[in-house]
Design a protein with these regions (language model features):
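Caspase-like (clan CD) cysteine peptidase catalytic core
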Residues: 7-34, 38-96, 143
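Short beta->alpha junction loops
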Residues: 1-7
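Active-site-proximal C-terminal subdomain of hydrolase catalytic domains
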Residues: 2, 79-145
């Protein structure tokens, strides 16, 4: 999906679950997200921000812990997740998310099952753009041959 809304992302996650369930443990799932992430100011939990979320309330986004839980709900061969987003509260282009500065701490106990997660940054780190290539630096090197 390109420029996915919250509804479209949730539908996509549901479709992935249906695929995993129907393959009876033989599915190999790959999930990729490039965009903004944002921490909740009170709980410090990380959220992915779809295009229809304004960035003022992280809870309007897709909670990472819920995403991981849904991706491992059914038995699969493996699940690989690639996230090119930062959760420091800053935005690559310093747009409306730039004023936030909430440090999150990874919660490793939320990840269960045969899932591996690759992220462009963690905690208070920023994910950098590669403007000349119109990608994030993480995505550019992920796609490079």
């Amino acid at each position: 999906m390109l420029d996915a809304t919250t509804g479209q992302m949730n539908q996509g996650i549901s479709k992935i679950n249906l695929i995993a369930k129907s393959t009876k443990g033989n599915a190999e799932l790959f999930v990729y997200f490039a965009g903004h992430g944002l921490p909740d100011e009170q709980t410090k939990e990380a959220y992915l921000m779809p295009v229809d979320v304004n960035g003022k309330n992280a809870k309007d986004g897709i909670k990472l812990a819920n995403l991981y839980s849904k991706l491992t709900e059914f038995q699969t061969k493996n699940v690989s997740v690639f996230i090119d987003a930062c959760f420091s509260g800053g935005a690559r282009n310093q747009s409306l998310l730039a004023a936030r500065g909430v440090k999150i701490q990874p919660k490793e106990d939320i990840i269960k099952g045969n899932i591996v997660i690759f992220t462009a940054s963690s905690g208070a780190q920023s994910s950098l753009p590669y403007k000349e290539k119109n990608h994030g630096l993480f995505t550019y090197y992920l796609l490079k041959k």
